[in-house]
Amino acid sequence: MMRTPGLLGLRGFVAFAAKLWSFVLYLLRRQFRTIIQYQTVRYDVLPLSPASRNRLSQVKRKVLVLDLDETLIHSHHDGVLRPTVRPGTPPDFILKVVIDKHPVRFFVHKRPHVDFFLEVVSQWYELVVFTASMEIYGSAVADKLDNNKGVLRRRFYRQHCTLELGSYIKDLSVVHSDLSSVVILDNSPGAYRSHPDNAIPIKSWFSDPSDTALLNLLPMLDALRFTADVRSVLSRNLHQHRLW
């Protein structure tokens, strides 16, 4: 069967149009990802009503305990690039520390909106860093996140954890004796095994530039500071392990 030049030309045009449309869609997706990554975000901290101020004066100021790795940041060191980090993705900062007499560089990526998150929650809570990492590394990361603002002064490290069955457990009683006022934000359920009713789970973060988990938590943290006992709320929300 002979194919007419007109039919061949039409098929060629259709094939070209399909390729062109695929390229346009690629450019649109790339631009959309850029818009998401660099969008301006806000969470308005409005003046409290007289009733809210009165309520807040009747309860203790709460303590928010913050994990570092995969909660606020993600890092990898020299020679190790995890598949979760896209090759060529620039780190937010580089740390140079000495571990066992060997210099090691850590390439640290900040979770989206972490600076804004810390700025807001530091107005509501006393912030405490509690990481299972070594102090020489955890302290350097906390210094960068604090950025001389003085909101991450209290810090606890691996030596303050308890090692059980190969996992580091964080004892919140070393942070504050009154656990009714303590909240921990951590991506690892094993870390707060001893205090599940004080925990807000958060999904682990590695590289997704469109992640909004920290922003999603702000309304809850805003409301939680008004409670007399945080456990009365958090004990009802174990299903949150899949939400954030």
UniProtKB/Swiss-Prot annotation:
One Pfam family in the UniProt entry: NIF
Keyword Transmembrane helix on entry: yes
Spans traversing the lipid bilayer: 7-29
Disulfide bridges in this chain: none
Broad enzyme group: hydrolase
CDD domains in the record: HAD_FCP1-like (cd07521)
UniProt keyword annotations, A-Z: Cytoplasm, Developmental protein, Differentiation, Hydrolase, Membrane, Neurogenesis, Protein phosphatase, Transmembrane, Transmembrane helix
UniProt-reported outcome of changing D69E: Strongly reduces phosphatase activity
Catalyzed chemical reaction(s): O-phospho-L-seryl-[protein] + H2O = L-seryl-[protein] + phosphate; O-phospho-L-threonyl-[protein] + H2O = L-threonyl-[protein] + phosphate
GO molecular function: phosphoprotein phosphatase activity; protein serine/threonine phosphatase activity
GO biological process, one term: neural precursor cell proliferation
Compartment annotation: Membrane; Cytoplasm, Perinuclear region
Membrane-protein topology: Single-pass membrane protein
EC number: 3.1.3.16
FCP1 homology domain mapped to chain residues: 58-225
GO cellular component entries: cytoplasm; endoplasmic reticulum membrane; Nem1-Spo7 phosphatase complex; nuclear envelope; nuclear membrane; perinuclear region of cytoplasm
Job description of the protein: Serine/threonine protein phosphatase that may dephosphorylate and activate lipins. Lipins are phosphatidate phosphatases that catalyze the conversion of phosphatidic acid to diacylglycerol and control the metabolism of fatty acids at different levels. May indirectly modulate the lipid composition of nuclear and/or endoplasmic reticulum membranes and be required for proper nuclear membrane morphology and/or dynamics. May also indirectly regulate the production of lipid droplets and triacylglycerol. Induces neuronal differentiation by antagonizing BMP signaling.
Entry's family note: Belongs to the dullard family.
Entry-linked PANTHER family: DULLARD PROTEIN PHOSPHATASE
Quaternary structure (record): Interacts with bmpr1a, bmpr1b and bmpr2.
Name of the protein this chain belongs to: CTD nuclear envelope phosphatase 1
Lineage of producing organism: Eukaryota, Metazoa, Chordata, Craniata, Vertebrata
